[in-house]
Swiss-Prot record:
Coiled coil: none annotated. Residues 10-204 form the tr-type G domain. SUPFAM superfamilies: EF-Tu/eEF-1alpha/eIF2-gamma C-terminal domain (SSF50465), P-loop containing nucleoside triphosphate hydrolases (SSF52540), Translation proteins (SSF50447). The gene is tuf1. This is Elongation factor Tu 1. Residues 81-84 are annotated as: G3. It holds the Pfam family GTP_EFTU_D2. It comes from Yersinia enterocolitica serotype O:8 / biotype 1B (strain NCTC 13174 / 8081).
Amino acid sequence: MSKEKFERTKPHVNVGTIGHVDHGKTTLTAAITTVLAKTYGGNARAFDQIDNAPEEKARGITINTSHVEYDTPSRHYAHVDCPGHADYVKNMITGAAQMDGAILVVAATDGPMPQTREHILLGRQVGVPYIIVFMNKCDMVDDEELLELVEMEVRDLLSTYDFPGDDTPVVRGSALKALEGEPEWEAKIIELAGYLDSYIPEPERAIDKPFLLPIEDVFSISGRGTVVTGRVERGIVKVGEEVEIVGLKDTVKSTCTGVEMFRKLLDEGRAGENVGVLLRGIKREDIERGQVLAKPGSIKPHTKFESEVYILSKDEGGRHTPFFKGYRPQFYFRTTDVTGTIELPEGVEMVMPGDNIQMIVNLIAPIAMDDGLRFAIREGGRTVGAGVVAKVIE
């Protein structure tokens, strides 16, 4: 068995399986790796290898996730699959496994079920941009009309949550039969892989996005000015470019007059690098940790937003008691805590440890944010929850 060399030339795309318990997500994951390995080369992963997923800690939260990889001729995929419903909720909210697209698995024998709906809603809230449907267990349904009905229901459900239900690719297959090597069902897995290639666009790389650096520290260097340090989250900053300082106070413009890394001077700082950026005409006291340095106009400060949050269970080191409306924790964005108040949905009086919930947050100071930004909820420095900005309000 020759070891394949890792092809860096292929675009890398992150996907995952979502859907109701026992509809066949893990079987499908195994079938994809098996059929694609057989067709295009690569490694197959057996069902039981995927099913006993290792525990991971993301921001102090315990999540069971399996990671598999597979290739089509044009792309390399990293695929996540979770054994339990709670794991999906935590995974999607924390962004532990970011998905460029998801495969929604719906058993044709059952049709859409409560978790089908919940995973679609979560996908909408946390910004999963594309969903492809795999109708599973179609070998067990003889009635063509029933298949039509299930497909219609799934498309309606997607449309309800603002996904393009009418245009979403739907593949009718059987993960188990494909795994057992039956050619007509293997062909359905190849069809699914074709949709992964064609329907999910190549994700924009961090380096191609507008420049943003969360400020971790501020120094003044006599005779040179003020330096901010941090890790460039996205984009590139070049010496001589205009930048904005956003968040906590009024937005201020400045010019980058130097970039340094490990005491060496550079022409630019790129996504992923820890750099110091020298700013023209800015006083040390004008700027603080928690603000961001960004390409002018690319990000705005906000105080009010709709969010999807997961509250840690007692076992995860979270609260031991529920909280109620009027709860005022700190919200930790990038590098700093900001106090905020919450509004719970209509009819929800309290939130228990281990729950996930939609809530509106009002911060006492503005933070540079876009939809999809992750945050932690803290009480006196201890993490009690994780969340994602679903929609900026003001």
